[in-house]
Structure formats: C-alpha cells, structure tokens
Curated annotation (Swiss-Prot):
EC annotation from Swiss-Prot or TrEMBL: 7.1.1.6
Pfam families per the UniProt record, alphabetical: Rieske, TM_PetC
Annotated Gene Ontology cellular component terms: plasma membrane-derived thylakoid membrane
Function: Component of the cytochrome b6-f complex, which mediates electron transfer between photosystem II (PSII) and photosystem I (PSI), cyclic electron flow around PSI, and state transitions.
Remarks, miscellaneous: The Rieske iron-sulfur protein is a high potential 2Fe-2S protein.
Disulfide bonds: C112-C127
Keywords assigned by UniProt, alphabetized: 2Fe-2S, Disulfide bond, Electron transport, Iron, Iron-sulfur, Membrane, Metal-binding, Thylakoid, Translocase, Transmembrane, Transmembrane helix, Transport
Membrane-spanning intervals of the chain: 20-42
Name of the protein in its database record: Cytochrome b6-f complex iron-sulfur subunit
Length: 178
C-alpha cells in the first residue's frame, strides 16, 4: 500500500474552491432554465397604469392607437400580439376608437389560429370548421367554448392588453380562461 505525502493531498482551500465552483455552475444553469418558465407565467408589464402588456404588431413593435386607426377602417378586426404573445384581435369600433375588448384568436378545439371572415361576419376555424360570432362566442362546434377575451386599454396613444377576469358578457358566466 502506498502512502500519500502531504504534498499529494489537495489543500482544503482548493477543495472548497472546487465545491463552490461546482455549486455556482449548477445554480446558474438551473436559474437560466427557470427564467423562461417564470416569464411565461408572469409576462413583463410594459408601462401604463392599467398594468397590461403592450400590444405589438407582427414584427414585435408596440402599437400606437393613432397609427392603428389610420391604417384600419371601422369594423376592422386585425391580429396583434397580446398576452403571452398570443394572437389577439383588435376591433376598430369607429374612426377614432379601438374596442375595449380583444378576442384571443386561438381556437378552443385544437388550438388553431382562427381567421376573421368579414363576408360571413364571423370567425371560422380552418382546421375543423368551428365558428364564432363577431364577439367570439361559439356558434358551431366542434369547439366546446367561446374564444377568450382580453381587456384593451389605450393610454397616451399606447395600446395595452390585460387579462379579462370579470364575467363573460357573451355567456353571463365566469370566464373559463382565468
């Protein structure tokens, strides 16, 4: 059996340093992996007293109410990035007004994006034919539920989207998406 000389045994300082380095690396990796998960459940808030998320166009740029209204006629329903980046319809109610609610464009059947059909005045899902009226209430299945709602607020020409937690005005029931 060979005996180790004192110079062969690592010093306690070196051992502590290696333990600290290993622990720090593992902690950094774990926190880095948890960051996107935390952002998914707690999206960053973009200014505004309403506490909502800034509505963004297809390029990810924040939308201004004046710019949106100048490019979209009354009655228009166009997609923006809403809560958690979900496609959400902004409704133009007049030449100077964006509706106070938006409609999440994700079908409640299998999650397809539901386009607005202006000729039929309803949303029609291309995947399995579910249909929703102009306010997003389901009128024909197989979708089991109406499209989710979101609050739309305009503050200082900025458009914000926030969670709808009140009674669903289309059904008179508690919202299924909260």
């Amino acid at each position: 059996m060979t005996q180790m000389t004192p110079s062969d045994v690592p010093s306690m300082g070196r051992r502590q340093f290696m333990n600290l380095l290993t622990f720090g690396t593992a902690t950094g990796v774990a926190l880095g992996a948890l960051y996107p998960v935390a952002n998914y459940f707690m999206p960053l808030r973009a200014g505004g007293g309403g506490g909502g998320t800034s509505a963004k166009d297809e390029l990810g740029n924040p939308i201004t109410a004046s710019g949106w209204l100048s490019n979209h006629p009354a009655g228009d329903r166009s997609l923006v990035q809403g809560l958690k980046g979900d496609p959400t319809y902004l409704i133009v109610e007049g030449s100077e007004a964006i509706g106070n609610f938006g409609i999440n464009a994700i079908c409640t059947h299998l999650g397809c994006v539901v386009p607005w059909n202006s000729g039929a005045n309803k949303y029609i899902c291309p995947c399995h034919g579910s249909q929703y009226d102009a306010n997003g209430k389901v009128v024909r299945g197989p979708a089991p539920l109406s499209l989710a709602l979101a609050h739309i607020d305009v503050e200082d020409d900025k458009v914000f989207v926030s969670q709808w937690a009140e009674t669903d005005f289309r059904t008179g029931e508690k919202p299924w998406w909260t």
